[in-house]
């Protein structure tokens, strides 16, 4: 449970549309009336007002202090898998934040490390949903190593490496499995792999536990389009891309029960 004698410090991120901005401003006013403190630099709680894209933005803005910051979402967008609240519940949420100790739920993250042929400094990223790897042009050809052993040579459009919470995003559209976020794992899913008499891939999603590392090694020296959640990055002279379950975790503030499978049902099946 999160609550100390010191006033809770909060920040709000908004989708930027009129409805979200008005809701965010109203929440800020109400919470300040409860003597909570607003600080965009070092918040205890970040309130995301919008859709899943807004929460992804908030996550990357505060990914340097994940051990100190928890997130809660208010859904005003098209898809709100990460959001527990809707605008009609604004006053109920404000009172809960101001008066109720909240439970912190931690979910696994994906760590992506990109190393370069020139031996320069490596680039390291954290993903809440997924990392995708594609060639800028042509077919992606990658050697896939698991725990240091060559597993396959992949040929196709690309690869998607997702977290358990991210398994409901792009990974699901690719036919990957939905993983419960209590599982410390990542999932590797193919995008339109080439399979014929000459070339073979496993053709199935791979679920790797926390102590397994997936290493992608380019066969050809080409440029890569690599996405980390909503961020799209062009990388040249790539030697390898290492993917593993991160040591860090994302923390969500829960003011009421919202079981994962109910969240999945509400997002994809329920009317």
Swiss-Prot record:
Keywords: ATP-binding, Cytoplasm, Kinase, NAD, NADP, Nucleotide-binding, Transferase. Its main location: cytoplasm. It catalyses: NAD(+) + ATP = ADP + NADP(+) + H(+). The keyword Transferase applies. It holds the Pfam family NAD_kinase. GO terms for molecular function: ATP binding; metal ion binding; NAD binding; NAD+ kinase activity. Belongs to the NAD kinase family. This is NAD kinase 1. The gene is nadK1.
